[in-house]
Regions:
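Flexible beta->alpha loop and helix N-cap segments adjacent to enzyme active/binding sites
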Residues: 2, 9-13, 17-40, 47-51, ...
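Short HxH-centered metal-ligating active-site micro-motif
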Residues: 56-67, 78-82, 509, 513, ...
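Short glycine-rich phosphate-binding loop at a beta-alpha junction
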Residues: 72-83, 128-129, 290-299, 400
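Short acidic-aromatic active-site loops that bind/stabilize oxyanions
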Residues: 104-105, 128-131, 256, 260-276, ...
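Phosphate/ATP-binding catalytic cores across multiple sugar-kinase/actin-like superfamilies
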Residues: 268-294
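Short beta-strand-loop/turn "lid" adjacent to the catalytic site in phosphate-handling enzymes
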Residues: 70-112, 139-140
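N-terminal phosphate-binding loop and adjacent alpha-helix
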Residues: 46-70, 278
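Phosphate/pyrophosphate-binding loops at sites that engage ATP/ADP/AMP, CoA/4′-phosphopantetheine
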Residues: 62-76, 118-122, 281-290
Length: 555
């Protein structure tokens, strides 16, 4: 059975007049599942080059079909990442401001029209199904965790008029315990506060990096007015109090202005509040259900600092965070859920990688692309790519590294990465100036040989693999000065372990770098500038290489 999961908006890239605001329909993606197994998955932004694309992911759908060698007629079910009721409500809301829109205001009718228009064939409307948003998040985590049983927490801004749920996963089933209304949205809570720091939607991860520079105690009493912890894992948010309480105390930062001590303290207090609320919920349901494993998904689960605190807390034996925890991951969850309902269950083996996107092609295909850029670039084949790249990095070079299929989700995990020596602290500012043009406080992540991670980082007992760069952990005290480029101001790093079995070419590069430089770690950041999404194709990589200050491009 072929099932196609879909997230994103209900309009094409050229249909701007009726666009639903991106905050409602972001991170468009398509995921193709065959008999419970992921065949292909890609975010629309990688193909249309629009960050957090809210368009109907027609290019992603085309990619998935092409990769499988399938036709649209071969898809048994199209699984959309929200309920039909919610989608219809968004269309009706849009109609209030755009009465010239044609009727009927039916999400299924719109989706059917988009698919039939693009692929020029009739599609049975019964093949289009809608999935509860947070259940899609939850399934995306539990179904791929490898756990037989687990507590599951899905939390985000909002979707389907809710902001999260708690469930218990047991073997092939997922049983909901409680849902959180929009009034308890931790995503909205975070967003409402960061506007005082000069940030908005999709900037939440930046504040996570700013928080260690501040003192949470400065505003702790103020934040106590914004939320309260209740018995049995419940909590209340008082979002209406945020602006009146902070406006007299905080000067709202404008874009380009420096961060004041107030802004840093506010970020620290916000991060502390989020962690307190989530741990309060988890402590209760850990005790009430007896579940010893935890799965996390939803946009809030991309808060890697929070994830690290959960891992260190010892509440759970094992913690799995869906690497595509944002709404693109709902395309994955929706497809998995619908496949399961039709008797096709994923393997209970834990997820080891998310290299499900575009392949860069054969050596001949790569050479053909590079030949098209002659006059702007020169290139040659290397007899030992890993060794030569490692030697260049050890000598101070910053390289673009592109290989294999692209990653699904927001992290570059060794297939679409910018890499450098993790030792000189000056490399942080150098790469920011060269490529990223981003805030200087934001840390870079390390990729480390899986078998040596414990030499450099404080890895909780029982944890051996951290393949998705989604936990912030402590750098060992004696290694912090050595790893100056990847150690944050609070002595932490967002750790990515690399397995020889899962990504042999990247592992070989890090091993070669260890032989050159004495450390089995490299600095790894996503291969993009501060405007575009992560590169997907060789063509994308060449363009980014030419428009930044990278020293070398390795393909």
């Amino acid at each position: 059975m072929l099932c196609l999961g879909i997230s994103g908006g209900l309009n094409l890239i050229h249909e701007n007049p009726y666009e639903i605001p991106k905050v409602f329909t972001h991170d468009g993606a398509a995921v193709l599942i065959e008999d419970g197994k992921v065949v292909a998955a890609i975010e629309e932004e990688r193909l249309n080059r629009i960050k957090h694309s809210n368009k109907f992911p027609i290019r992603s759908i085309g990619f998935c079909l092409d990769h499988r060698g399938a036709r649209i007629q071969d898809i048994e079910r199209f699984a959309f990442y929200a309920t039909e009721e919610y989608c219809n409500a968004l269309l009706s809301r849009l109609y209030l401001t755009r009465p010239e829109m044609k009727k009927p205001l039916s999400a299924k009718a719109v989706m059917l029209e988009l698919l039939q228009q693009e692929f020029q064939c009739d599609i049975d409307p019964e093949r289009i199904v809608f999935v509860r948003h947070h259940m899609a998040h939850a399934v995306s985590a539990f179904a791929l965790s490898g756990f037989e049983r687990s507590l599951v927490l899905a939390i985000d801004g909002y979707g389907d008029f809710l902001s999260g749920l708690v469930a218990i996963g047991e073997e092939q089933s997922l049983n909901q315990i409680v849902t959180f209304p929009q009034s308890k949205s931790l995503g909205v809570f975070y967003l409402d506060v960061i506007q005082f720091i000069g940030y908005g939607s999709f900037d939440e991860y930046k504040v996570m990096g700013l928080a260690p520079y501040g003192n949470a105690e400065v505003y702790r009493s103020v934040f106590s007015e914004f939320y309260e912890l209740k018995p049995e894992g419940d909590y209340a948010l008082h979002l209406d109090r945020i602006v009146p309480a902070l406006l007299p105390k905080i000067e709202i930062r404008k874009k380009g202005q420096p961060f004041s001590p107030q802004h840093k303290d506010l970020a620290a207090a916000l991060q502390q509040a989020l962690e307190r609320i989530v741990l309060h919920v988890l402590r209760h349901y850990r005790q009430a259900t007896g579940q010893r494993n935890l799965c996390l998904a939803g946009g809030v689960a991309h808060n890697c600092t929070m994830n690290g605190k959960i891992l260190y807390s010892g509440l759970f034996d094992q913690v799995f965070v869906q690497p595509a925890a944002h709404d693109a991951g709902c395309a994955l969850g929706a497809a998995l859920l619908v496949s399961q309902e039709r008797g096709h269950y994923p393997s209970r083996q834990p997820l080891t990688h998310v290299y499900w996107g575009s392949d860069i092609g054969t050596p001949a295909e790569i050479a053909a692309v590079l030949n098209g850029w002659r006059g702007l670039i020169s290139f040659r084949r290397s007899p030992d790519v890993a060794r030569e790249a490692a030697t260049l990095m050890a000598a101070g070079a910053v390289i673009g590294w592109v290989q294999g299929r692209s990653e699904f989700g927001p992290r570059a995990l060794g297939n679409r990465s910018i890499l450098a020596d993790p030792r000189p602290a000056a490399n942080k500012e150098r790469i920011n100036r060269m490529v990223k043009k981003r805030e200087g406080y934001r840390p870079f992540a390390p990729s480390v040989l899986e078998e040596e991670a414990g030499e450099y980082f404080e890895i909780p007992e029982g944890t051996t693999k951290l393949p998705f760069m989604i936990f912030v952990l402590k750098v060992k005290q004696e290694k912090r000065e050595l790893l100056g480029a990847i150690t944050h101001v609070d002595g932490t790093a967002r750790v990515h372990t690399v397995s020889k079995e899962t990504n042999p070419r990247y592992w070989e590069l890090i091993k070669a770098f260890e032989e050159e430089a004495g450390v089995g770690v490299v600095l790894n950041t996503s291969f993009n500038n501060n405007v575009e999404p992560i590169v997907d194709s060789v063509e994308d990589a060449v363009v980014t290489y030419l428009t930044t200050g990278l020293d070398y491009l390795v393909v």
